[in-house]
């Protein structure tokens, strides 16, 4: 079968090369175009490019291997591509989009947070405090702000941070 005077097998190959190249470019420069698909989530460029890549690859291989009509091969390739794109969307893109970005924090962000002593803080000495949050758990060295001993398991309030060491005081809920 021919399409626009070109054999369908050649069209599949050209589409595969173009879609594969665009997919590779989108992989490297996708952040530049990230806002284009905000309003229409089902037209995610990753899914569209993946569909055309899978469709053209399936059609090309089908034309080489299967002794079926070109329309049936195109239909089978389209169905296979839709299934692969749906699986890609459900099992890769949705979990990646809902994943936490990082555990990056500034030390100033810890000021005013509550933590729990995991190594007792002696008078004029160092202990350790763990601060739990949505992004994860942070463990930091700590000294007593009031120069008093703070025992294990005490809930503390971070008052200040000096050179990566937290100054804490026991927290008393109101």
UniProtKB/Swiss-Prot annotation:
The gene is nfeD2. Disruption phenotype: Alters assembly of FloT membrane rafts; more diffuse rafts are seen. Double floA-nfeD2 deletion mutants are wild-type. No visible effect on FloT membrane assemblies. It comes from Bacillus subtilis (strain 168). Its main location: membrane. This is Membrane protein NfeD2. Belongs to the NfeD family. InterPro entries: NA-bd_OB-fold. One of its GO terms (cellular component) is plasma membrane. Induction: Expression is sigma W-dependent. Up-regulated by alkali shock and by infection with phage SPP1. Keywords: Cell membrane, Membrane, Transmembrane, Transmembrane helix. The chain crosses the membrane at residues 16-36, 47-67, 72-92. It is a multi-pass membrane protein. The keyword Transmembrane applies. Coiled coil: none annotated. It is found in: Cell membrane; Membrane raft. It comes from the Bacteria. Plays a role in assembly of FloT membrane rafts, probably recruited to rafts by FloT.
